[in-house]
Amino acid sequence: KGEIALSLERMTAIEEIDVASRTMTVQSGAILQNVQEAAEEHGFLYPLDLGGRGSATIGGNISTNAGGNRVIRYGMTRDQVLAVEVVLADGTIIPMQGKAIKNNTGYDLKHIFISGEGTLGVVTKAVLRLRALPKSQCCTWVSVPSFDALTRFLGFMDGACEGSLSSFEVMWADYYEFITGATTPHKPPVPYGDPFTVLVETQGMQPEKNQSRFEEILGEALETELITDAVIAKNQAERSALWDIRDDVMQQLQLMPMWSFDVSLGIKDMD
């Protein structure tokens, strides 16, 4: 009652890519995948990524403070946003506050609008931070025997990968068996049986060295029984196949409608 729907779907322009500053200025209706591809064309990475990249908009990402698949390395959406332009309910336009990565002048007002879902104002434009485009991506799907082993495996990978760990996507057994079951197009990368499986990805700059070290690290994890099995992607097609299993969750959940939630828990509060 008394609500309106405001669409920014025609505000799709990528207004500027500043190579020197490593920033991109976009309108809120810009599609995430288009932003990623534009960044890559200039040798950069826009690190926010999620399964709905082909339809998700930057304005939606900002309004919900989307996390995505690479939070463990790059942080949430708010960590990728340097400035926003906002329109208030009375039509007042709050202009963007610059695009410097280091800015300690006064209040950083953008943060009250990021994750605000439009309740305080509508984000119409944003300056995004870009990163160096990785030259290598190593990807594996592993089985983990217990939650204790899972937490230790995370710590082990974070240290052994020396800052290159970009994704650590945990799936409980019931989800894994569902998403790779007979009604889906996906085949299970590792056998069923363990309570957890994990999709692990690293990003680096030295392809041969990174892949070799990645395989060594997984070998150590197997030897110390942090994991029980692992399948390593050998090429982009195999990496995409693994990520498709993770990204297909929303499509498959349409087969069994339910209320979905995006919640965060401390690791010590989980089992």
Residue ranges and their predicted role:
Residues 1-271:
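Noncatalytic alpha-helical scaffold of FAD-dependent oxidoreductases
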